[in-house]
Every structure is written in C-alpha cells, then in structure tokens.
A protein has these predicted regions:
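Positively charged n-region of N-terminal signal peptides that target proteins for export
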Residues: 1-4
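Extended carbohydrate-recognition surfaces in non-catalytic/accessory domains of CAZymes
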Residues: 21-98, 186
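An acidic-aromatic loop/edge-strand motif
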Residues: 28, 136-193
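Hydrophobic residues positioned within well-ordered beta-strands of beta-sheet architectures
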Residues: 41, 90-92, 104, 142-144, ...
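Solvent-exposed beta-strand/loop surfaces of large extracellular or lumenal domains
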Residues: 62, 120-141
Length: 193
C-alpha cells in the first residue's frame, strides 16, 4: 500500500505541471501559452467602486495596486486596513503573445462577483451591489473556456461582500491549456476528498 501511494505521488510530481511563476506588475501580466498560469501579482484595485469594463472608466480613476492573492481586508500595502464588508473592482491586463483558447479556473469570491473578459461577462455568482439591501451572496468555483487575443486582454472583477469575515478573493484565477487544466482540477478535487 505504501509503495502504491509513493508511486502515485511520484507520478503527480512528474506529470502535473506546477505552472509558471510570472507575476503581474502594476496590473499587467504576459501570457505566452503556459499550460498553467496563476494570475498572481499586482492587480489594480478600486475600493468602494464598481467600475464597468473599458479603458475610459479606469483612466479616470487612478488605481491602488494590491498583491493578489489576499483578501482586501488583509492587504499590507494599503494605507489603512479595509473592513471585510464593502465592494470593489479589480483589474488586470493580460498581454497575450498570440491568440490562445484557454481554460480559466475561477475560484469562489467572498461573496458575490461578476468577471468580465474584454468587456464580456463570462462568469459571476450572486448579485454584486454597493448596498447590502440589493446584494445577493453566493459562492461557486467555475471553469470556463475563453479566447485571449493577441495583445491586451482586460480582466475586470467586481466583488461585493456584506456577509463574510473576509472580502475579495484568496485563491488566484488560473488560466492555461484547456486540454490540461480541467483534468488537473479534477485530480486535485479527488486528492482533497
């Protein structure tokens, strides 16, 4: 039995890619066809603002850059500690070296979110709102297949939380090969159970 477990872990080590360690800098990250890339690093962050996708909305509002992945009430680089309850917009520009069809693994956000890629809503949970009365919480992990176009691709995530002790997201969005990433996720779920 021990030998079988040892062989299984050796197999995982050799066959499950760990992914790239590229990090976003000042809200920009490059994707060059990696099998797995966590969208870690500095994201543009707009506290108490639910901004719509598009260049104009973001040029009129100077960002604060926060290291992802961390709840917004745990960001060390902010001048003041934010409360867990509130709402915000995150933005990341992914520069793609060519057109790529990719899988996008989207973690659960605390506690409602809307995720846009190049202006199109591709995923969401609950109802994002700037008030507790109209916000609806939900929490689901999802996997989508999307197109990254050569050049700049804008990811905008609107998040609201009026229920949980932590706000924002604590696991990275991951992009990668659509033939590999979903199977890697399934394998991780099997291991966790």
């Amino acid at each position: 039995m021990k030998r079988g477990l040892f062989s299984f872990f050796i197999f995982l080590t050799l066959h499950v890619p760990l992914g790239s360690y590229a990090q976003a800098v000042k809200g920009v990250l490059t994707y060059a066809g990696e099998e797995r890339l966590a969208l870690d690093g500095e994201w543009a962050f707009y506290w108490k603002q639910l901004l719509e996708p598009g260049y104009e909305a973001f040029t009129a509002n100077p960002p604060t850059y926060v290291k992802q992945v961390s709840y917004w009430n745990a960001h060390q680089e902010l001048k003041e500690q934010l409360p867990a309850f509130g709402y915000a917009t995150y933005r990341l520009v992914v520069k793609s070296t060519q057109d790529y069809r990719v899988a996008m693994e989207i973690p659960g956000f605390n506690l409602s979110y809307a995720l846009f890629l190049n202006g199109e809503l591709i995923s969401g949970d609950g109802v994002v709102s700037d008030s507790k009365g109209t916000y609806v919480p939900d929490w689901t992990v999802s996997m989508k297949t999307v197109m990254l176009h050569e050049g700049e691709n804008e990811i905008v995530v609107q998040v609201a939380n009026f229920d949980h002790s932590n706000g924002g997201f604590f696991k990275p969005i991951i992009i990668g090969d659509p033939d590999i990433l979903p199977h890697e996720r399934d394998l991780n779920l099997i291991i966790e159970t």
